[in-house]
């Protein structure tokens, strides 16, 4: 059986057992440096303060910034079966990012697209997220392999597109 003979639904990943996620929201941008991660952080904090259970999957593997924004310095843990996210101190927001797995978080991640896409998928399928109302996926800039993989393999309910005014002005 190949991908062409499968239904689109069969390509969608399922979260780790015991994980229940209400809505998955991708936060995307056409280029870097427009504040996408800041929007993700602020939205997560705002939702958590309103009483929603929210988690953040940092899919920006080559430029992760979510852990630093929350002041997270401890590493994610795992057992033989599953990884566990690191929780923010004040609002208890679970976060999974490549920075939380690397021995030295300042080491560059120089991986090919399929490896990065596979890692992002693992952050969804092999992390014990628990019960969440929202999972925010902080996407890398652009529309490359990772974005395509996320939108094909995760049941994304919506997207937030972050753009700077300069980008919009140039299109007019």
Each PLM stretch: what is its role?
Residues 45, 49, 125, 152:
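Short, well-ordered alpha-helices that flank and scaffold nucleotide-derived cofactor binding pockets
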Residues 53-55, 59-105, 110, 117:
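Phosphate-binding loop that captures ATP/GTP phosphates
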Residues 78, 98-114, 121-149:
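Switch II (G3) loop of P-loop NTPases
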Residues 1-31:
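Extreme N-terminal, non-catalytic leader segments
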Residues 133-134, 140-172:
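Conserved catalytic-core segment of NTP-binding enzymes
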Residues 23-61:
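Walker A/P-loop phosphate-binding motif and the immediately C-terminal alpha-helix
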Residues 18, 63, 80, 113-121, ...:
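Amphipathic alpha-helical transducer elements in NTP-driven molecular machines
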């Amino acid at each position: 059986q190949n991908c062409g003979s499968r239904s689109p639904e069969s390509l969608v990943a399922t979260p780790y057992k015991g994980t229940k996620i209400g809505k998955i929201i991708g936060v995307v941008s056409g280029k870097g440096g427009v504040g996408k991660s800041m929007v993700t952080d602020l939205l997560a904090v705002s939702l958590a303060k309103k009483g929603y259970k929210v988690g953040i999957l940092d899919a920006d593997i080559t430029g992760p910034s979510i852990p630093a924004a929350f002041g997270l310095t401890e590493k994610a843990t795992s057992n033989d079966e599953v990884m566990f996210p690191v929780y923010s101190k004040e609002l208890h927001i679970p976060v999974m990012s490549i920075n939380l797995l690397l021995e030295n978080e300042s080491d560059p991640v120089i991986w090919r697209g399929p490896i990065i896409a596979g890692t992002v998928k693992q952050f969804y399928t092999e992390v014990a997220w628990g019960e969440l109302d929202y999972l925010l996926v902080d996407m890398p800039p652009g529309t490359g392999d990772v974005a395509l993989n996320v939108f094909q393999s995760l049941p994304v309910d919506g997207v937030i597109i972050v753009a700077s005014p300069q980008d919009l002005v140039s299109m007019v």
